[in-house]
Protein backbone atom coordinates (compact mmCIF):
# COMPACT_ATOMS: atom_id res chain seq x y z
CA UNK A 1 0.00 0.00 0.00
CA UNK A 2 2.86 2.33 0.82
CA UNK A 3 4.46 1.55 -2.54
CA UNK A 4 1.23 2.41 -4.35
CA UNK A 5 0.71 5.54 -2.29
CA UNK A 6 4.26 6.81 -2.40
CA UNK A 7 5.29 5.88 -5.92
CA UNK A 8 2.45 4.92 -8.27
CA UNK A 9 -0.05 7.64 -7.33
CA UNK A 10 2.44 10.55 -7.72
CA UNK A 11 3.46 9.11 -11.10
CA UNK A 12 -0.15 9.00 -12.27
CA UNK A 13 -0.80 12.50 -10.94
CA UNK A 14 2.26 13.85 -12.74
CA UNK A 15 1.12 12.24 -16.00
CA UNK A 16 -2.50 13.34 -15.80
CA UNK A 17 -2.27 16.47 -13.70
CA UNK A 18 -2.31 19.97 -15.13
CA UNK A 19 1.14 21.41 -15.70
CA UNK A 20 1.85 24.95 -14.65
CA UNK A 21 2.33 27.18 -17.66
CA UNK A 22 4.40 30.36 -17.45
CA UNK A 23 2.51 33.63 -17.76
CA UNK A 24 2.53 35.51 -21.08
CA UNK A 25 3.57 32.41 -23.02
CA UNK A 26 1.24 33.55 -25.81
CA UNK A 27 0.71 37.19 -26.75
CA UNK A 28 -2.43 38.48 -28.46
CA UNK A 29 -2.02 40.78 -31.47
CA UNK A 30 -4.18 43.85 -30.63
CA UNK A 31 -4.84 44.53 -34.32
CA UNK A 32 -5.91 41.05 -35.48
CA UNK A 33 -6.47 38.96 -32.35
CA UNK A 34 -3.88 36.42 -33.50
CA UNK A 35 -2.03 34.57 -30.74
CA UNK A 36 1.76 34.71 -31.11
CA UNK A 37 4.28 32.59 -29.23
CA UNK A 38 6.31 34.84 -26.92
CA UNK A 39 9.69 33.51 -28.10
CA UNK A 40 8.76 34.15 -31.74
CA UNK A 41 7.70 37.67 -30.84
CA UNK A 42 10.89 38.38 -28.91
CA UNK A 43 13.10 37.07 -31.72
CA UNK A 44 11.34 39.55 -34.03
CA UNK A 45 11.99 42.53 -31.70
CA UNK A 46 8.39 42.40 -30.43
CA UNK A 47 6.96 43.11 -33.88
CA UNK A 48 4.09 40.75 -34.83
CA UNK A 49 5.47 38.79 -37.82
CA UNK A 50 2.17 38.49 -39.72
CA UNK A 51 0.64 41.95 -39.19
CA UNK A 52 3.71 44.11 -38.50
CA UNK A 53 2.06 45.49 -35.36
CA UNK A 54 4.67 47.01 -33.05
CA UNK A 55 4.19 45.90 -29.45
CA UNK A 56 5.58 47.96 -26.60
CA UNK A 57 9.11 47.01 -25.67
CA UNK A 58 11.05 47.40 -22.44
CA UNK A 59 14.00 49.78 -22.38
CA UNK A 60 16.66 47.13 -21.79
CA UNK A 61 15.29 44.95 -24.61
CA UNK A 62 15.35 47.92 -26.96
CA UNK A 63 18.96 48.70 -26.07
CA UNK A 64 19.90 45.03 -26.54
CA UNK A 65 18.40 44.93 -30.02
CA UNK A 66 19.76 48.35 -30.97
CA UNK A 67 23.45 48.15 -30.02
CA UNK A 68 26.06 46.03 -31.78
CA UNK A 69 26.06 42.45 -30.45
CA UNK A 70 23.57 43.57 -27.78
CA UNK A 71 26.46 45.01 -25.78
CA UNK A 72 26.18 48.31 -23.93
CA UNK A 73 26.84 49.94 -20.57
CA UNK A 74 24.24 51.89 -18.63
CA UNK A 75 24.65 55.07 -16.62
CA UNK A 76 23.71 54.89 -12.97
CA UNK A 77 20.36 56.57 -12.41
CA UNK A 78 20.70 59.98 -10.71
CA UNK A 79 19.36 60.35 -7.19
CA UNK A 80 16.45 62.75 -6.67
CA UNK A 81 13.95 63.39 -3.83
CA UNK A 82 11.38 60.60 -4.01
CA UNK A 83 8.18 62.31 -2.84
CA UNK A 84 8.73 66.00 -1.98
CA UNK A 85 5.00 66.81 -2.22
CA UNK A 86 3.90 63.86 -0.03
CA UNK A 87 1.34 63.12 -2.73
CA UNK A 88 -1.44 60.59 -2.27
CA UNK A 89 -4.31 59.50 -4.50
CA UNK A 90 -5.57 55.90 -4.22
CA UNK A 91 -2.24 55.08 -2.58
CA UNK A 92 0.83 56.98 -1.46
CA UNK A 93 3.07 58.08 -4.33
CA UNK A 94 6.15 56.72 -2.58
CA UNK A 95 4.45 53.31 -2.30
CA UNK A 96 3.54 53.47 -5.98
CA UNK A 97 7.18 54.20 -6.84
CA UNK A 98 8.37 51.26 -4.75
CA UNK A 99 5.84 49.01 -6.48
CA UNK A 100 7.00 49.99 -9.98
CA UNK A 101 10.65 49.68 -9.01
CA UNK A 102 10.01 46.19 -7.70
CA UNK A 103 8.07 45.13 -10.81
CA UNK A 104 10.40 46.61 -13.44
CA UNK A 105 13.80 46.52 -11.76
CA UNK A 106 14.25 50.17 -12.80
CA UNK A 107 14.75 53.31 -10.71
CA UNK A 108 12.58 55.40 -13.05
CA UNK A 109 11.27 55.56 -16.61
CA UNK A 110 14.60 56.42 -18.31
CA UNK A 111 17.62 54.24 -19.10
CA UNK A 112 20.80 55.68 -20.66
CA UNK A 113 22.99 53.30 -22.63
CA UNK A 114 26.47 53.73 -24.13
CA UNK A 115 27.48 51.55 -27.06
CA UNK A 116 28.00 51.37 -30.81
CA UNK A 117 25.80 50.80 -33.85
CA UNK A 118 27.70 49.54 -36.90
CA UNK A 119 30.85 50.62 -35.08
CA UNK A 120 29.70 54.20 -34.43
CA UNK A 121 29.76 55.20 -30.72
CA UNK A 122 26.57 56.87 -29.50
CA UNK A 123 24.52 57.58 -26.39
CA UNK A 124 20.99 56.16 -26.40
CA UNK A 125 18.33 57.45 -24.01
CA UNK A 126 15.28 55.18 -23.76
CA UNK A 127 11.94 55.92 -22.14
CA UNK A 128 10.13 52.84 -20.79
CA UNK A 129 6.32 52.99 -20.82
CA UNK A 130 6.08 50.10 -18.36
CA UNK A 131 7.31 52.40 -15.57
CA UNK A 132 4.30 54.60 -14.71
CA UNK A 133 3.43 55.10 -18.35
CA UNK A 134 6.86 56.56 -19.09
CA UNK A 135 5.75 59.69 -17.26
CA UNK A 136 8.17 62.58 -16.89
CA UNK A 137 9.07 63.40 -13.31
CA UNK A 138 12.18 64.60 -11.53
CA UNK A 139 13.94 61.24 -11.79
CA UNK A 140 13.23 60.84 -15.51
CA UNK A 141 14.06 64.48 -16.22
CA UNK A 142 17.38 64.26 -14.40
CA UNK A 143 18.24 61.03 -16.25
CA UNK A 144 17.48 62.64 -19.62
CA UNK A 145 19.75 65.58 -18.77
CA UNK A 146 22.41 63.10 -17.63
CA UNK A 147 22.26 61.42 -21.05
CA UNK A 148 22.72 64.72 -22.87
CA UNK A 149 25.59 65.75 -20.61
CA UNK A 150 27.33 62.40 -21.19
CA UNK A 151 26.91 62.77 -24.96
CA UNK A 152 28.49 66.24 -24.79
CA UNK A 153 31.32 64.98 -22.58
CA UNK A 154 32.10 62.07 -24.93
CA UNK A 155 31.33 64.09 -28.09
CA UNK A 156 28.85 61.48 -29.29
CA UNK A 157 25.50 61.77 -31.12
CA UNK A 158 22.44 61.07 -28.99
CA UNK A 159 19.49 58.91 -30.03
CA UNK A 160 16.40 59.25 -27.84
CA UNK A 161 13.49 56.79 -27.89
CA UNK A 162 10.39 58.58 -26.59
CA UNK A 163 7.45 56.69 -25.07
CA UNK A 164 5.34 58.55 -22.54
CA UNK A 165 1.89 59.58 -21.45
CA UNK A 166 3.23 62.98 -20.39
CA UNK A 167 4.11 64.73 -17.15
CA UNK A 168 3.86 62.81 -13.86
CA UNK A 169 0.88 64.31 -12.04
CA UNK A 170 2.05 63.07 -8.63
CA UNK A 171 4.96 65.53 -8.80
CA UNK A 172 2.95 68.58 -9.87
CA UNK A 173 4.96 71.67 -10.81
CA UNK A 174 8.21 69.78 -10.15
CA UNK A 175 7.30 67.54 -13.06
CA UNK A 176 6.48 70.48 -15.34
CA UNK A 177 9.87 71.99 -14.50
CA UNK A 178 11.47 69.14 -16.44
CA UNK A 179 10.10 70.51 -19.74
CA UNK A 180 12.32 73.65 -19.81
CA UNK A 181 15.21 71.79 -18.16
CA UNK A 182 15.29 69.08 -20.84
CA UNK A 183 14.83 71.72 -23.55
CA UNK A 184 17.95 73.50 -22.30
CA UNK A 185 19.82 70.16 -22.40
CA UNK A 186 18.83 69.73 -26.07
CA UNK A 187 20.15 73.22 -26.87
CA UNK A 188 23.43 72.44 -25.09
CA UNK A 189 23.87 69.36 -27.29
CA UNK A 190 23.18 71.34 -30.44
CA UNK A 191 25.56 74.13 -29.39
CA UNK A 192 28.22 71.44 -29.05
CA UNK A 193 27.59 70.56 -32.70
CA UNK A 194 26.32 67.04 -31.95
CA UNK A 195 23.54 65.21 -33.76
CA UNK A 196 20.23 64.55 -31.98
CA UNK A 197 17.90 61.90 -33.41
CA UNK A 198 14.48 61.22 -31.87
CA UNK A 199 12.55 57.99 -32.36
CA UNK A 200 8.86 58.48 -31.54
CA UNK A 201 7.24 55.26 -30.34
CA UNK A 202 3.74 54.32 -29.21
CA UNK A 203 2.59 56.40 -27.41
CA UNK A 204 4.39 59.76 -27.31
CA UNK A 205 1.99 62.28 -25.80
CA UNK A 206 1.64 65.10 -23.32
CA UNK A 207 4.47 67.27 -22.08
CA UNK A 208 7.23 65.29 -23.78
CA UNK A 209 5.88 66.45 -27.17
CA UNK A 210 6.10 70.02 -25.87
CA UNK A 211 9.79 69.60 -25.08
CA UNK A 212 12.65 67.24 -25.94
CA UNK A 213 10.67 64.73 -28.05
CA UNK A 214 9.98 67.21 -30.85
CA UNK A 215 13.30 69.06 -30.87
CA UNK A 216 15.46 66.55 -32.74
CA UNK A 217 17.50 67.20 -35.85
CA UNK A 218 15.77 64.15 -37.33
CA UNK A 219 12.45 62.66 -36.22
CA UNK A 220 11.72 59.00 -36.92
CA UNK A 221 8.46 57.34 -35.91
CA UNK A 222 7.64 53.67 -35.50
CA UNK A 223 4.62 52.48 -37.55
CA UNK A 224 1.22 53.01 -35.96
CA UNK A 225 2.51 55.11 -33.06
CA UNK A 226 0.16 57.59 -31.37
CA UNK A 227 1.92 60.97 -31.29
CA UNK A 228 0.40 64.20 -30.02
CA UNK A 229 -0.08 66.56 -27.09
CA UNK A 230 -3.62 65.64 -26.03
CA UNK A 231 -5.18 62.29 -26.91
CA UNK A 232 -7.78 62.07 -29.71
CA UNK A 233 -10.65 61.37 -27.30
CA UNK A 234 -9.87 64.51 -25.30
CA UNK A 235 -9.68 66.59 -28.48
CA UNK A 236 -13.01 65.26 -29.78
CA UNK A 237 -14.71 66.00 -26.47
CA UNK A 238 -13.29 69.53 -26.51
CA UNK A 239 -14.02 70.58 -30.11
CA UNK A 240 -17.13 68.34 -30.40
CA UNK A 241 -16.08 67.15 -33.84
CA UNK A 242 -14.99 63.82 -35.27
CA UNK A 243 -11.27 63.71 -36.02
CA UNK A 244 -9.91 62.44 -39.37
CA UNK A 245 -9.15 58.74 -39.57
CA UNK A 246 -5.63 57.98 -38.39
CA UNK A 247 -5.29 61.41 -36.79
CA UNK A 248 -2.12 61.59 -34.64
CA UNK A 249 -0.75 58.35 -36.06
CA UNK A 250 2.86 58.33 -37.19
CA UNK A 251 1.78 57.88 -40.82
CA UNK A 252 -0.61 60.86 -40.60
CA UNK A 253 2.10 63.02 -39.08
CA UNK A 254 4.60 62.11 -41.80
CA UNK A 255 2.05 62.99 -44.49
CA UNK A 256 1.63 66.40 -42.83
CA UNK A 257 5.33 67.11 -42.34
CA UNK A 258 5.57 66.57 -38.59
CA UNK A 259 8.02 63.65 -38.73
CA UNK A 260 10.73 62.91 -41.28
CA UNK A 261 10.18 59.20 -41.78
CA UNK A 262 8.29 56.16 -40.51
CA UNK A 263 10.61 53.17 -40.02
CA UNK A 264 9.93 49.63 -38.85
CA UNK A 265 11.70 48.65 -35.65
CA UNK A 266 13.40 45.89 -37.62
CA UNK A 267 15.07 48.50 -39.84
CA UNK A 268 15.77 51.17 -37.23
CA UNK A 269 19.36 50.25 -36.47
CA UNK A 270 20.46 50.18 -40.12
CA UNK A 271 18.56 53.38 -40.90
CA UNK A 272 19.95 55.33 -37.95
CA UNK A 273 23.49 54.05 -38.62
CA UNK A 274 23.23 55.25 -42.22
CA UNK A 275 21.92 58.65 -41.11
CA UNK A 276 24.73 58.98 -38.57
CA UNK A 277 27.33 58.22 -41.23
CA UNK A 278 25.83 60.77 -43.60
CA UNK A 279 25.36 63.51 -40.99
CA UNK A 280 28.76 63.00 -39.34
CA UNK A 281 30.54 62.46 -42.69
CA UNK A 282 31.62 58.93 -41.84
CA UNK A 283 32.25 56.43 -44.66
CA UNK A 284 28.91 54.86 -45.51
CA UNK A 285 28.45 51.11 -45.83
CA UNK A 286 27.24 50.51 -49.36
CA UNK A 287 25.58 47.26 -48.26
CA UNK A 288 23.35 49.01 -45.72
CA UNK A 289 19.74 49.62 -46.84
CA UNK A 290 18.80 53.16 -47.76
CA UNK A 291 16.56 55.07 -45.31
CA UNK A 292 12.84 55.12 -46.21
CA UNK A 293 11.65 58.07 -48.23
CA UNK A 294 11.07 61.07 -45.98
CA UNK A 295 7.83 63.01 -45.84
CA UNK A 296 7.48 66.40 -47.47
Curated annotation (Swiss-Prot):
Record bears the keyword Transferase: yes
CoA carboxyltransferase N-terminal domain boundaries: 25-294
Family annotation (PROSITE patterns): COA_CT_NTER (PS50980)
The protein's Enzyme Commission number: 2.1.3.15
Pathway assigned in UniProt: Lipid metabolism; malonyl-CoA biosynthesis; malonyl-CoA from acetyl-CoA: step 1/1
Membrane-spanning intervals of the chain: none
InterPro entries: AcCoA_carboxyl_beta, Acetyl_CoA_COase_Trfase_b_su, ClpP/crotonase-like_dom_sf, COA_CT_N
Coiled coil location: none
Disulfide topology: none
Gene Ontology cellular component list: acetate CoA-transferase complex
Keywords: ATP-binding, Cytoplasm, Fatty acid biosynthesis, Fatty acid metabolism, Lipid biosynthesis, Lipid metabolism, Nucleotide-binding, Transferase
Molecular function GO terms recorded: acetyl-CoA carboxylase activity; ATP binding; carboxyl- or carbamoyltransferase activity
Keyword set includes Nucleotide-binding: yes
Localization of this protein: Cytoplasm
Family stated for the protein in its record: Belongs to the AccD/PCCB family.
The protein's role, per its UniProt record: Component of the acetyl coenzyme A carboxylase (ACC) complex. Biotin carboxylase (BC) catalyzes the carboxylation of biotin on its carrier protein (BCCP) and then the CO(2) group is transferred by the transcarboxylase to acetyl-CoA to form malonyl-CoA.
Subunit structure of this chain's protein: Acetyl-CoA carboxylase is a heterohexamer composed of biotin carboxyl carrier protein (AccB), biotin carboxylase (AccC) and two subunits each of ACCase subunit alpha (AccA) and ACCase subunit beta (AccD).
Protein name in the entry: Acetyl-coenzyme A carboxylase carboxyl transferase subunit beta
